[in-house]
């Protein structure tokens, strides 16, 4: 199965480490970097625009905003996915994220399994498209 490279922007160290562990254990996702702030995340994503397949972003960060990061991040190619993973998900947040081009939104408190499933499906899709 083809490996997908992810970057995680999450300010809670426990959640970040648990998320990384789950993704790397249960899917083909390999986390290539992470940060706790908007500026650090945006800097890495800009400097490595071709080196990630998905970015997973919390909306509320130590410094900065996940929404602003999503507004400012530029995809290096159309297949890159932007995923929001936050405790503050409701209909208006989902609508705003969709307007900003976010590919998927998951609630941390109830939808981590859905996030893992989404990543696993994306792994399978990319592998099938690559013909491996």
Q: What positions do the PLM features span?
A:
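Conserved acidic carboxylate
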Residues: 10
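Two-component/phosphorelay signaling modules centered on CheY-like receiver
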Residues: 13-33
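Acidic, metal-coordinating helix/loop segments flanking the phosphotransfer/catalytic sites
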Residues: 34-54
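Active-site residues of response regulator receiver
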Residues: 58-59
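The feature encodes the CheY-like receiver
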Residues: 62
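Short amphipathic alpha-helix used as the core "switch/output" element in two-component signaling
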Residues: 67-78
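Alpha4 helix (beta4-alpha4-beta5 surface) of REC/receiver domains from two-component response regulators
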Residues: 68, 89-106, 110
């Amino acid at each position: 199965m083809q490996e997908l490279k992810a970057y995680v922007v999450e300010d809670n160290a426990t959640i970040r480490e648990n998320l990384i562990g789950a993704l790397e254990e249960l899917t083909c996702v390999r986390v290539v970097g992470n940060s706790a702030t908007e500026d650090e995340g945006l800097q890495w994503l800009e400097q490595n625009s071709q080196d990630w397949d998905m970015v997973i972003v919390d909306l509320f960060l130590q410094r900065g905003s996940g929404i602003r990061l999503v507004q400012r991040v530029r995809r290096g190619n159309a297949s890159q996915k932007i995923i929001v993973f936050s405790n503050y998900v409701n209909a208006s947040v989902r609508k705003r994220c969709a307007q900003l081009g976010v590919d998927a939104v998951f609630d941390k408190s109830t939808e981590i399994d859905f996030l893992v499933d989404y990543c696993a499906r994306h792994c399978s899709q990319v592998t099938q498209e690559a013909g491996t």
